[in-house]
Design a protein with these regions (language model features):
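Glycine-rich anion-binding loops and their surrounding alpha/beta cores
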Residues: 1-128
Length: 128
Protein backbone atom coordinates (compact mmCIF):
# COMPACT_ATOMS: atom_id res chain seq x y z
CA UNK A 1 0.00 0.00 0.00
CA UNK A 2 1.31 3.45 -0.87
CA UNK A 3 0.27 7.08 -1.25
CA UNK A 4 1.54 9.52 -3.84
CA UNK A 5 0.78 13.04 -2.66
CA UNK A 6 0.91 16.39 -4.43
CA UNK A 7 -0.59 19.50 -2.92
CA UNK A 8 -2.04 22.09 -5.26
CA UNK A 9 0.15 24.79 -3.76
CA UNK A 10 3.26 22.93 -4.94
CA UNK A 11 4.40 21.26 -1.74
CA UNK A 12 5.53 17.64 -1.91
CA UNK A 13 3.42 16.79 1.13
CA UNK A 14 -0.17 17.24 2.20
CA UNK A 15 -0.95 20.91 2.61
CA UNK A 16 -3.06 22.83 5.08
CA UNK A 17 -3.24 25.77 2.66
CA UNK A 18 -4.84 24.10 -0.35
CA UNK A 19 -6.26 20.82 -1.53
CA UNK A 20 -3.94 17.86 -1.86
CA UNK A 21 -4.29 15.31 -4.65
CA UNK A 22 -3.69 11.70 -3.64
CA UNK A 23 -3.09 8.51 -5.57
CA UNK A 24 -3.57 5.54 -3.28
CA UNK A 25 -2.12 2.24 -4.43
CA UNK A 26 -3.77 -0.71 -2.72
CA UNK A 27 -4.29 -4.33 -3.76
CA UNK A 28 -3.11 -3.77 -7.35
CA UNK A 29 -5.51 -0.88 -7.88
CA UNK A 30 -5.10 2.88 -7.83
CA UNK A 31 -7.65 5.22 -6.29
CA UNK A 32 -7.51 8.95 -6.91
CA UNK A 33 -8.96 11.52 -4.54
CA UNK A 34 -8.38 14.95 -3.06
CA UNK A 35 -8.05 16.02 0.54
CA UNK A 36 -9.38 19.41 1.53
CA UNK A 37 -7.97 20.29 4.96
CA UNK A 38 -11.01 22.46 5.70
CA UNK A 39 -13.16 19.30 5.59
CA UNK A 40 -11.28 18.21 8.72
CA UNK A 41 -11.34 21.59 10.46
CA UNK A 42 -7.73 22.34 9.55
CA UNK A 43 -6.93 25.85 8.37
CA UNK A 44 -3.50 27.33 7.85
CA UNK A 45 -2.64 30.98 8.35
CA UNK A 46 0.37 31.57 6.11
CA UNK A 47 2.77 29.26 4.31
CA UNK A 48 5.52 31.64 5.49
CA UNK A 49 5.04 30.26 9.03
CA UNK A 50 6.48 26.88 8.05
CA UNK A 51 9.34 28.08 5.87
CA UNK A 52 12.76 27.76 7.39
CA UNK A 53 16.20 28.94 6.40
CA UNK A 54 18.44 27.55 9.13
CA UNK A 55 18.98 24.58 11.39
CA UNK A 56 17.94 26.70 14.36
CA UNK A 57 14.61 27.72 12.83
CA UNK A 58 13.97 24.10 11.82
CA UNK A 59 14.60 23.01 15.40
CA UNK A 60 12.30 25.76 16.68
CA UNK A 61 9.55 24.44 14.41
CA UNK A 62 10.11 20.88 15.67
CA UNK A 63 9.84 22.05 19.28
CA UNK A 64 6.66 23.97 18.47
CA UNK A 65 5.10 20.78 17.11
CA UNK A 66 6.23 18.35 19.81
CA UNK A 67 5.24 20.75 22.59
CA UNK A 68 1.72 20.87 21.15
CA UNK A 69 1.74 24.60 20.46
CA UNK A 70 -1.04 25.59 18.08
CA UNK A 71 0.69 26.62 14.87
CA UNK A 72 0.73 25.93 11.16
CA UNK A 73 3.71 23.63 11.76
CA UNK A 74 1.65 21.56 14.20
CA UNK A 75 -1.30 21.43 11.81
CA UNK A 76 0.71 20.35 8.76
CA UNK A 77 2.67 17.80 10.81
CA UNK A 78 -0.59 16.43 12.19
CA UNK A 79 -2.10 16.04 8.71
CA UNK A 80 0.95 14.33 7.23
CA UNK A 81 1.45 12.04 10.22
CA UNK A 82 -2.22 11.10 10.06
CA UNK A 83 -1.85 10.10 6.41
CA UNK A 84 0.89 7.66 7.43
CA UNK A 85 -1.20 6.28 10.29
CA UNK A 86 -4.16 5.93 7.92
CA UNK A 87 -1.97 4.09 5.45
CA UNK A 88 -0.40 1.62 7.85
CA UNK A 89 -3.33 1.03 10.20
CA UNK A 90 -5.87 1.00 7.39
CA UNK A 91 -8.21 3.37 9.21
CA UNK A 92 -10.00 6.50 8.04
CA UNK A 93 -8.14 9.79 7.82
CA UNK A 94 -10.52 11.25 10.40
CA UNK A 95 -9.67 8.45 12.87
CA UNK A 96 -5.96 8.80 12.11
CA UNK A 97 -6.14 12.56 12.73
CA UNK A 98 -7.76 11.85 16.09
CA UNK A 99 -5.02 9.37 17.06
CA UNK A 100 -2.24 11.74 16.05
CA UNK A 101 -3.90 14.66 17.78
CA UNK A 102 -4.18 12.61 20.98
CA UNK A 103 -0.48 11.71 20.73
CA UNK A 104 0.43 15.39 20.49
CA UNK A 105 -1.96 16.53 23.22
CA UNK A 106 -0.71 13.85 25.62
CA UNK A 107 2.91 14.71 24.81
CA UNK A 108 3.67 11.21 23.56
CA UNK A 109 5.44 12.68 20.54
CA UNK A 110 7.58 14.92 22.74
CA UNK A 111 8.42 12.03 25.05
CA UNK A 112 9.43 9.79 22.13
CA UNK A 113 11.54 12.60 20.66
CA UNK A 114 13.31 13.05 24.00
CA UNK A 115 13.94 9.28 24.18
CA UNK A 116 15.50 9.51 20.73
CA UNK A 117 17.75 12.36 21.86
CA UNK A 118 18.82 10.41 24.96
CA UNK A 119 19.53 7.33 22.87
CA UNK A 120 21.63 9.18 20.29
CA UNK A 121 23.55 10.98 23.04
CA UNK A 122 24.31 7.63 24.70
CA UNK A 123 25.42 6.07 21.41
CA UNK A 124 27.64 9.06 20.79
CA UNK A 125 29.29 8.59 24.21
CA UNK A 126 29.71 4.86 23.62
CA UNK A 127 31.40 5.45 20.27
CA UNK A 128 33.96 7.84 21.74
Amino acid sequence: RALIINSRDGMDEASIYSQTDVLEIKNNSIDSYSINPKDFGIRGNSIEEIKTNSERSSLDIIYTVINNIDSDARKISLLNAALLVMLFKEISLRDALSECNDALENYLVRDKFNQYIDFTNQVSKDVK
